[in-house]
């Protein structure tokens, strides 16, 4: 349903005022605080229309109006293009580039803390997921005559290691040749790139040690598919300072929610680009009274993880969207820069 310019202006002004003050907004408030060439009666009629259309609602204890989730959605959809088209000053890039590529966990923690400080809300940063990482290198270290320790490294510094049985008559040189061949064929591939046809080629190339190849691929697939979630939180108390969360039951639910890393990872893992979920658009009941702004960050042009900011539906969307978009961009730039300088 389209809104004429007058209704749009009134709706946006009410939302902006409510975000700032957390108090219902009435027609007299609008005429006193803002420049409207309209009478209070006309504004009241327009507000009544906006309420009938589902963009505003009236709390029982007030004559003023507050935005509904539909009102916020209209407001946010108008904002996103505008926020992303305005160049932002550098916020975090210098700090991120001080870390080495293998210090990805530190990078994630720094990003979470910075996001919370910049927005005054709660931040969530999903670290690089192994399933979205690219294979970097296999290394093997002899344990005894029947076993080697196989170490797998991804391009994001994630390391997995497992002991692997080998035939006792395999020389060090033969083992080295096998590892070199696997590295040559697999480097830069994600788990989805390792197709049945590629596995068939590897078996043919290394027919004498098919068992070792099979075990290596099994470890690789296991490591990529079953890695644990890595979610960093920042400012968990920030959201609890908002007036919407004075209810002790809500507070307990949120705090319990923040402790479940797997659930947090699930909430963030489907996000690519800039996404804003408002209220009941969120899939989890614990955050049905919240809004979540997320953006993905990338390495080598592919989505690697997600950063997010969780706050009340009365969130300062314009500021949060701009900050989240900028930090995601800077995190991508920092990771790409490390990739280039450390290769």
UniProtKB/Swiss-Prot annotation:
GO MF entry, a single one: DNA binding
HAMAP family named among the record's database cross-references: HrcA
GO biological process, one term: negative regulation of DNA-templated transcription
UniProt entry keywords in alphabetical sequence: Repressor, Stress response, Transcription, Transcription regulation
Function noted in UniProt: Negative regulator of class I heat shock genes (grpE-dnaK-dnaJ and groELS operons). Prevents heat-shock induction of these operons.
InterPro entries: GAF-like_dom_sf (IPR029016), HrcA (IPR002571), HrcA_C (IPR021153), WH-like_DNA-bd_sf (IPR036388), WH_DNA-bd_sf (IPR036390), WHTH_transcript_rep_HrcA_IDD (IPR023120)
Annotated family: Belongs to the HrcA family.
SUPFAM superfamilies in the record: GAF domain-like, Winged helix' DNA-binding domain
Protein name from the UniProt record: Heat-inducible transcription repressor HrcA
């Amino acid at each position: 349903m389209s809104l004429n310019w007058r209704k749009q202006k009134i709706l946006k002004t009410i939302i902006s005022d409510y975000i700032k003050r957390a108090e219902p907004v009435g027609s007299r408030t609008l005429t006193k605080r803002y420049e409207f060439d309209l009478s209070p009666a006309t504004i009241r009629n327009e507000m009544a229309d906006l309420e009938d259309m589902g963009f505003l609602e009236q709390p029982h204890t007030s004559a003023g109006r507050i935005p509904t989730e539909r009102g916020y959605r209209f407001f946010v959809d108008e904002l996103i293009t505008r926020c992303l088209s305005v160049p932002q000053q550098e916020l975090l890039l210098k700090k991120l580039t001080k870390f080495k590529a293998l210090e990805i966990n530190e990078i994630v923690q720094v990003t979470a803390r910075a996001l919370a400080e910049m927005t005054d809300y709660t931040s969530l940063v999903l670290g690089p997921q192994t399933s979205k990482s690219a294979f970097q290198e296999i290394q093997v270290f002899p344990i005894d005559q029947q076993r080697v320790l196989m170490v797998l490294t991804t391009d994001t510094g994630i390391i997995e290691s497992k002991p692997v049985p080998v035939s006792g008559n395999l020389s060090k040189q033969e083992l080295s040749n096998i590892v070199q061949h696997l590295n040559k064929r697999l480097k830069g591939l994600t788990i989805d790139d390792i197709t049945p046809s590629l596995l068939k080629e590897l078996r043919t190339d290394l027919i004498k040690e098919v068992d070792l190849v099979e075990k290596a691929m099994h470890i690789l697939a296991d490591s990529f598919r079953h890695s644990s979630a890595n979610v960093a939180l920042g400012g968990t108390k920030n959201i609890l300072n908002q007036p919407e969360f004075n209810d002790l039951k809500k507070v307990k639910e949120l705090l319990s929610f923040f402790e479940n890393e797997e659930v947090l990872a699930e909430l963030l893992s489907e996000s690519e680009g800039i996404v804003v979920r408002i209220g009941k658009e969120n899939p989890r009941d614990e955050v049905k009274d919240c809004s979540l702004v997320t953006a993905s960050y990338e390495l080598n042009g592919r989505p690697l993880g997600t950063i997010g900011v969780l706050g009340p539906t009365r969130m300062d969307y314009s500021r949060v969207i701009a900050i989240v978009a900028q930090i995601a961009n800077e995190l991508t730039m920092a990771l790409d820069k490390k990739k280039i300088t450390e290769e």
